[in-house]
């Protein structure tokens, strides 16, 4: 089969692992930058055409693919999801589908979807730009977490120790036209969370992440430490439910333990493979390609 991966950085561990695994399974895989696409809607069939601009040379019409794996970063979400939508319109299976991918990339909309599915999440508020910052901050506890809507890898997440600081940060971001969420800080978790890697209807791998001393974020890209963990049945169930609530085939679901019980922090539609594979010792890439093969076959 001929597969396509949408990714700006083909040398990343996850991209290299998936390409190698796909090729070992007898498939061909192209890795293309979504920002180098031109999308065309035309009268004659096929109505959806895609052109690609290589680093050198002239643009060319892309062939049809058997399936596509989106691995683009947050800065490419708009164009990446447009490319995905174009491919989906040609009935090409996407792992994940464009609507679910876009939903997961928006922290507020994804939290709304989780809450609508009766999945517990931290207390969170999202205020319009004309809503008074002080009144918004009063609706959550202090210390307060502030998050931009589209950050990743811990970027765009701020901890305000005092309410006054939260107000000041919120006002500054609002003035810069940067939408921000306010969220309860789960201090009892001790800067630790659980990353669950979900494929289909099961958790295939998991790890516990802990932030460095003095760091409230547990993300690996912020220097977090990982270790193996055995999940309870409840943790597995919540992780799968969270992925399904967003309509994702593949997801990285982040869980955190609070005084009120287990909460879902967020759901990642393009979770990294490097730390989860190295920590758990599980070959996640092979399971992703196997799942994609079944999806293509309609199983």
From Swiss-Prot:
Gene Ontology, cellular component aspect: cytoplasm
Keywords: ATP-binding, Ligase, Magnesium, Manganese, Metal-binding, Nucleotide-binding, Protein biosynthesis
ATP-grasp domain ranges (all copies): 111-293
Required co-factors: Mg(2+); Mn(2+)
Binding residues annotated for Mn(2+) 2, in chain numbering: 266, 268
InterPro entries in alphabetical order: ATP-grasp, ATP-grasp_RimK-type, ATP_grasp_subdomain_1, RimK, Rimk_N, Rp_bS6_RimK/Lys_biosynth_LsyX
Binding site for Mg(2+) 2: 266, 268
Cofactor note: Binds 2 magnesium or manganese ions per subunit.
GO biological process, one term: SOS response
Broad EC category: ligase
The keyword Phosphoprotein appears for this protein: no
Lineage: superkingdom: Bacteria
Residues annotated to bind ATP: 147, 184-185, 193, 217-219
Protein name: Probable alpha-L-glutamate ligase
Protein family membership: Belongs to the RimK family.
Coiled-coil spans in chain: none
UniProt keyword Protein biosynthesis present: yes
E.C. numbers: 6.3.2.-
SUPFAM superfamilies given in the database record: Glutathione synthetase ATP-binding domain-like
Residues binding Mg(2+) 1: 254, 266
GO molecular function: ATP binding; metal ion binding; ribosomal S6-glutamic acid ligase activity
């Amino acid at each position: 089969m001929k597969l396509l991966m949408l990714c700006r950085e083909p040398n990343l561990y996850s991209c290299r692992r998936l390409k190698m695994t796909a090729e070992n399974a007898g498939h061909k895989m192209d890795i293309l930058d979504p920002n180098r696409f031109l999308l065309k809607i035309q009268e004659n069939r096929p109505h959806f055409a895609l052109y690609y601009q290589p680093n050198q040379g002239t643009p060319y019409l892309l062939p049809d693919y058997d399936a596509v794996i989106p691995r683009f970063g947050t800065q490419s979400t708009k164009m990446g999801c447009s490319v995905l939508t174009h491919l989906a319109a040609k009935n090409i299976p996407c792992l994940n589908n464009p609507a679910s991918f876009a939903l997961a990339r928006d922290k507020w909309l994804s939290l709304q979807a989780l809450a609508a599915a009766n999945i517990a999440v931290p207390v969170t508020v999202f205020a319009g730009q004309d809503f008074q910052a002080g009144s918004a901050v009063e609706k959550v506890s202090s210390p307060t977490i502030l998050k931009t809507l589209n950050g990743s890898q811990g970027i765009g997440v701020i901890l305000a120790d005092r309410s006054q600081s939260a107000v000041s940060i919120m006002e500054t971001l609002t003035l810069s036209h940067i939408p921000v969420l306010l969220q309860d800080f789960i201090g009892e978790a001790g800067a630790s969370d659980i990353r669950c890697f979900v494929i289909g209807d099961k958790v295939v791998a998991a790890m516990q992440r802990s932030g460095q001393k003095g760091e409230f974020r547990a993300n690996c890209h912020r220097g977090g430490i990982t270790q193996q963990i055995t999940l309870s049945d409840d943790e597995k169930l919540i992780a799968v439910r969270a992925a399904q609530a967003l309509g994702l085939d593949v997801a990285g679901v982040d869980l955190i333990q609070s005084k009120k019980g287990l909460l879902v922090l967020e759901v990642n539609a393009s979770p990294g493979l490097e730390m989860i594979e190295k920590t758990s010792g599980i070959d996640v890439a092979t399971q992703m390609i196997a799942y994609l093969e079944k999806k293509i076959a309609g199983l």
